[in-house]
C-alpha cells in the first residue's frame, strides 16, 4: 500500500495557537485555500479511497481532494484528533498557567501522561495505528489518502520510524502537509515527510 498521510488545512484556532483536540472547528479561509492547493498536488494520484477523520476540518480537506478522484470518502473514527479534554480552547500561555503539574508529567512521561479529562498519546497511537493496519489489509496494492491531524499523524510516523513517542517533538506536521509511506513485503518506507511545497504561493 502507498499511503498519502495528510494533515488538514489551517483553522482560526490554529492561527490563534489554541489547542483544538476533538473540538469541531472549520477550516479558515486560508485553510480552505491550503486544502485546494493540496488537492491540486494530488490530482494525478490514482487513489483507491480517501479516508478521513470525522472532524469537519479534516472532512473539508478530504472533500477538496475528492474533487479530482472518482472514489469514496470514508469517515474513520480512529483518525480523530487526540482528545485534549480541559486543554481544548486554551492557548499555550494558558496551559502553562493553569496546568503546570500536567506539563511536568507530559515532558517526562509523554506516552502515558493522560491529558486532563482526555487521552494519552499512547492511547491515540494504538487506535490510529489500528486504522492504518485496516487500510493496509484492504488495500495491499493500492494508493490511498488518509486525512487526519497533527498528533494523529505524529504518532503514526513515530510507529513507522520505530521511535518512542517521547521523540515526537523532533517531527513536524504543518497544515495541509502530506507525507508518503510505502508498505512493502520487505518493510515500511517513509518516502516523503511533511511536504508543503504545494503551498508556496499562499
What annotation goes with each model-predicted range?
Residues 71, 75, 82-96, 137, ...:
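Acidic, low-complexity terminal tails and accessory targeting/binding regions
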Residues 10-64, 68, 115-129:
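Loop-to-helix element that buttresses phosphate recognition and phosphoryl-transfer chemistry
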